[in-house]
Amino acid sequence: MNSAHNKNETTFQRSMKSRHLFMLSLGGVIGTGLFLSSGYTIQQAGPAGTILAYLVGAGIVYLVMLCLGELSVAMPVTGAFHTYAAKYIGPGTGFTVAWLYWLTWTVALGSEFTAAGLLMQRWFPHTSVWMWSAVFALFIFLLNAFSVKFFAESEFWFSSIKVLAIVLFILLGGSAMFGIIPIKGGEAAPMLSNFTAEGGLFPNGFVPILMTMLSVNFAFSGTELIGIAAGESVDPDKTIPKAIKTTVWRLSLFFVGTIFVLSGLIPIQDAGVIKSPFVAVFDRVGVPYAADIMNFVILTAILSAANSGLYASSRMLWSLSKEKTLHPTFAKLTSKGTPFNALVFSMIGGILSLLSSVFAPDTVYVVLVSISGFAVVVVWMGIAASQFMFRKRYIEAGNKVTDLKYRTPLYPFVPIAAFLLCLASVVGIAFDPNQRIALYCGVPFMAICYAIYYVKNRKSQPAADMTHSK
């Protein structure tokens, strides 16, 4: 199995550097949720509660990324955690993880193309949403189809715009909070008064904080893209650890800093009803054309997430095909090293998702969105379990841990803690009426994936043959 991978990996272009991996991960994580939904989160959990939830979420994702780092450096293959799960947990689990992750991103593609079309109507009110959706879908497809280097460079600049907007927001908003720069209209600097007003730091108690933690895990989804890109990165033993370290701490800074400034400048009773809290803050500090600037930033955020999503979903199909669990046509690469057939199929999936949001928004689309939200945490659990089993079998095979170029620290505590914390998030979904449907849809979908795999492969070689140590 390893030899097959190594033979094929030479056909992929190892073009991604550490800066590309870092921005690819940011591109998948920082989406419209931070720019549009953060005010609602603050209203539900309170200022301190939201910050606490994001800090805990960052801790969980850091544990998961430590596990992914060891796996990705030891086995830098395109497909990443699908391949690891198939090898170290079981082929049925690998198959299920791959389809869960593919569905997550293809569902996101549909909603992102629709949202991009709606945003363009601010500047072109008499044009069709669907025209813009088609234009952006073609644009994203071409970025991915041309070459890996072209994709990585475009994602770097997409993500750079988002990061610049967040950094400016934190600097300008923080300065206005503490009176360093004036607030429009001569209003006094609020300092930290909004943190203690309207019920204090935790105005709604601790239960809403727990519910916020569940959604915060989903907010951090996308960091695992670093693992998928391992097979196409330069010097993965150096670039992956560096990308993981910078991604997690900077994401934590961006998320927590944003929530801190929003909480300081927008009273909690207003936070949940403001359409775009970023626009509200930029407007208060006197930034001209704040609404248009943020419309552009959110548009790039959407296109960045779509760009990352099409990349991730196509690589999952390629990996499934290389593992002989999907038709071999999806493993074919162009002369530039891109899986064109997998890209086309993933784009079709995104378009079907878009159509379901139009023609069956309360049935098919709700089910798809629910499964995709549930899938992220399940994939993280798979990463933690894979690393636990990898290290165990690595040692059993007589290898030395010191020979690993990147080692997950505090083994086995880190993978066990990551797995249990993710499991707690999944269990917690059952107690939130708004998210419970994710379990009702996600668990049956997993069962169907397992059933399909074992029906198709009941005559294939035993799973034990696929779990030999590296």
From Swiss-Prot:
It is found in: Cell membrane. Keywords: Amino-acid transport, Cell membrane, Membrane, Transmembrane, Transmembrane helix, Transport. The chain crosses the membrane at residues 22-42, 48-68, 89-109, 128-148, 163-183, 200-220, 254-274, 285-305, 340-360, 364-384, 411-431, 437-457. GO terms for molecular function: amino acid transmembrane transporter activity. PROSITE patterns: AMINO_ACID_PERMEASE_1. InterPro entries: AA-permease/SLC12A_dom (IPR004841), Amino_acid_permease_CS (IPR004840). It is a multi-pass membrane protein. The gene is ybgF. Disulfide bonds: none annotated. It comes from Bacillus subtilis (strain 168). Belongs to the amino acid-polyamine-organocation (APC) superfamily. One of its GO terms (biological process) is amino acid transmembrane transport. This is Uncharacterized amino acid permease YbgF. The keyword Transferase does not apply. One of its GO terms (cellular component) is membrane.
